[in-house]
Amino acid sequence: MEFKLEAHRIVSISLGKIYNSRVQRGGIKLHKNLLVSLVLRSARQVYLSDPCPGLYLAGPAGTPAVPPPQQPGEPVAGPPSGWGEPPPPVARAAWPEPEPQPQPQPQRPSVCHTPGAGSSEPVAAVAGSGEALRGGEEDSAAAAWGRVERPRAASSGGGSDACPEGPRAVRRPCGCPPAVEERSSEDGSPAPPAPCPRKRGAAGVGGGRASCSAPGSTPLKKPRRNSEEQPVTGEDDTDEEMETGNVANLISIFGSSFSGLLRKSPAGGREEEEAEEGGPEAAEPGQICCDKPVLRDMSPWSTAIVAF
C-alpha cells in the first residue's frame, strides 16, 4: 500500500509539472515527452507490482503472461538454422547448368569445370576468367573509341570551324539561333543573353537584363521568407495552445484513472485523502474527483496503460 501511495505521489507531481509548464514558453516541447514517459513508467510499476491484480482488472493478469512464452520461443526458432542447409544444394544445382553452354565456346570450359576439380584448379580458372574479362573490356573500349572517333573525323572533314561548333551546339539546349552567337564571337563583343530559361538565372546573378533578373533575383525571395515566417509563428502559438489543451486532457484522464484505482482498493479512506491532496498539485479538483460511473468509463484507459 505504501508503494502505491508513493507511485501516486510521483504521478501527481509529474502531472503538476506538466500543468504548470504552460507558463513557460516552450517548456512543454522540452519536458512533455520525459514527463509522459515518467507517468507511464510509474503506471506500469503500480500495475505490475500489485500482488493480486485480479481484484482491480482482469487485463493486467493476462498481459504479463503473454511475453514469457514468446521469449524462449524466439531463440529456439529454427528458421536461422534451417537457412544454412538448403543453400549448398542450390549452389550445386547452379554450377552444372552452365556446363552445356561452353561446349560451342572454347573460352569458358576452363571456368565451368574448375568447381568440381579441386582447390588448386579454381585459382587458374579465376586467372583465366580475369584475362577473358580484360580482353572483353579491351574490345568494348576499342569499339566505343571507334564510335567516338567517327563523328570527330566527319566534323574535321567539314572544316576547321567545325570543332568549336560542337560545344556551341551543346550550349544551345533550348533551340537558340546559332547565327547570333557566331556573329558576336566574330566581332569580339560579348554575346547578348539568349531568351533561354536556363540563362535567366545566370543573367540575374551576373547583373544582366532587368526582365531576366526579376524572376531569379534574391530580393524577391526575402519578402516571401518574411511572409512565411509570420504564419509559422502564429502556428507555433496555436500548437502551444493545442498542446496545453492536450496536457489538460492528459491530466483529467490519468488523474481520474489513478483515483479510481485507488478508490477500488479496500483501504479507501486513506487513499481518497491522498488523491484529494494530490488533486490540487496535478490539476483542478473537479477533474480528478469524479463520480463512480465516470470511473467505470475510464477503466479502458488503465488497460491501455498496461498495454503500453
Swiss-Prot record:
Protein name stated in the entry: Immediate early response gene 5 protein
Family according to the record: Belongs to the IER family.
Compositional bias per record (Low complexity), positions renumbered to this chain: 73-84
Gene Ontology terms for molecular function: identical protein binding
Function (record text): Plays a role as a transcription factor. Mediates positive transcriptional regulation of several chaperone gene during the heat shock response in a HSF1-dependent manner. Mediates negative transcriptional regulation of CDC25B expression. Plays a role in the dephosphorylation of the heat shock factor HSF1 and ribosomal protein S6 kinase (S6K) by the protein phosphatase PP2A. Involved in the regulation of cell proliferation and resistance to thermal stress. Involved in the cell cycle checkpoint and survival in response to ionizing radiation. Associates with chromatin to the CDC25B promoter.
Assembly mode: Monomer. Homodimer. Associates with the catalytic subunit of protein phosphatase PP2A. Interacts (via N- and C-terminal regions) with PPP2R2B. Interacts with PPP2R2A, PPP2R2C and PPP2R2D. Interacts (via N-terminus) with RPS6KB1. Interacts (via central region) with HSF1; this interaction promotes PPP2CA-induced HSF1 dephosphorylation, leading to enhanced HSF1 transcriptional activity.
GO cellular component, one term: nucleus
Record keywords: Activator, Cytoplasm, Nucleus, Repressor, Stress response, Transcription, Transcription regulation
This protein's record includes keyword Nucleus: yes
Keyword Nucleus attached: yes
GO aspect biological process, one term: positive regulation of cellular response to heat
Native source species: Mus musculus
Primary gene name: Ier5
